[in-house]
């Protein structure tokens, strides 16, 4: 039986007796609008944990369609299980949720079957906004950027880009209307875009605009397990794709280029000094006086530096470097796909197929990836079209090679294209470094797993010292994107602080910018410390790559909020100045100038200091003494950490054994994942997985080949197992092995 909701109905007294008490009903307004438009509420069951709630204005006998923006993995999620109109209350079951819908104000109480209330929603027709409860525990998500770790207490206008916002410390803003309540719920506001006011116990989401077709479309998830919440978001917007292995190595960015010799000299120095590096990135002319191309947005090479681009690329490739140039689109819109036809006589840069065609000549020369900058004015659909273009476009010419692109903009769903994201043009200050830890955590919780920052900060300030650079470098070694970039670019290479040369300054247009005094540019410690963290990053690649693979199956980021693994530890949930690196490592970056110690909260359980191997009981804050070369790292008891040899680039061949370090104190398991690192052959079974399990009570380690995988070279595999100073060597052939200690 259908009724039409309107204020006129309310005045006629059609509210009726409530099936359950909804607290907000006692706070109804007395005003009314006789001409209010009737609303139809659609409830669609997505899974046992997630349902869709759509508020659609009635247009005669029908409702408007819900527009698509590209964020969801599909447009249709099946028929609604309920279409509610009318002024009486309605009780609806959607998976594990029980919904009680009341007509005035339009209120929805969401509870479990046992009556435990999860959330209360209320639609305010006067302001066209949705009110919900913030709860008493932290709120996370809302994309990259934002002024605080716990989103409670903030007003978020959800404006994308770098202008008008606290760019200097907080970086660019990539807002995503996905909000997580750590008490066990989350919401993705699919349409339309809007503002979050989280400054009180009752939060408000106000769409930027509503239309005759749609008032609001959201997806609601309820689950006590944080991993389930992340998996449900991935169900809606997609799982991350596997990036190429080389993108997880070190990436060195350049700015103003003096000559061909300078470009080759940087590459040569990395190899001569044996400082691991995989990627060389070149800024475009227009963003600096002399970049890789001739002008902003151009695909023509700068002949003063790259007189023979193909020969130059071949030379860099021969030294095992990947090459990534900076690109800027000159249109504020982008539509279509790379598969569409492009009329070259009517070239339209806003058409993805036409714009991608402009890349293909340089790509054919040997370009390995792209750095698409800017895009702030783009709407959501255009941003996602751009991300998709840099994923699908390269595959037109190299169908079995994983693409790489480093973006400054995106939206929900960008993870489906293995997009990397960085935080924009931040300033070199201690406050910026400090801010980027919670910023990184919320970015990962918003479904963006591949994130990083300009190590050292983009704009140098009087705070830009060797110490700040080192601390930022240490943090960067534990970000998915490990990349140095910024003005005074010669101070961004690991040996730059011992040459006396900061490079072209290029700071004239930045208030508060400054170049370090030349007396500071002879510090030999910097290269030594950078080497330590470069080598550690490369040694940990087996662990990191396995965690990236795990994310493609679960939606979990590599940089993880402590909440994801310790949801019942209130101190861990509210901790925003440290994070988990995968499931085993706890990373506590040093963000204070001249720090001699670092306060670290260790969640409940036992922990091992990575550097000293000292075992410590968690559930408390400790004080870790530090020097300049030490960033506190802890490993969770009950962990198996695979480590490889030091390599100069990710694809370097080595006969050295794989090392498995066991951190005892609890049972442990780990899936080591390997594939060729470049192709999509893993989709067809070309991958190797080694299942590892540690039995704490028996002190035994079991190794076996993962189901549906097979051995990859070298076979047999030499494995060194370490436990409390003891070492055992074993050859793994694919057959199960059990070792005792």
Placement of each model-derived feature along the sequence:
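Catalytic-domain carbohydrate-binding cleft regions of carbohydrate-active enzymes
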Residues: 116-629
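Long, structured stretches of catalytic cores involved in phosphate-ester chemistry, encompassing
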Residues: 632
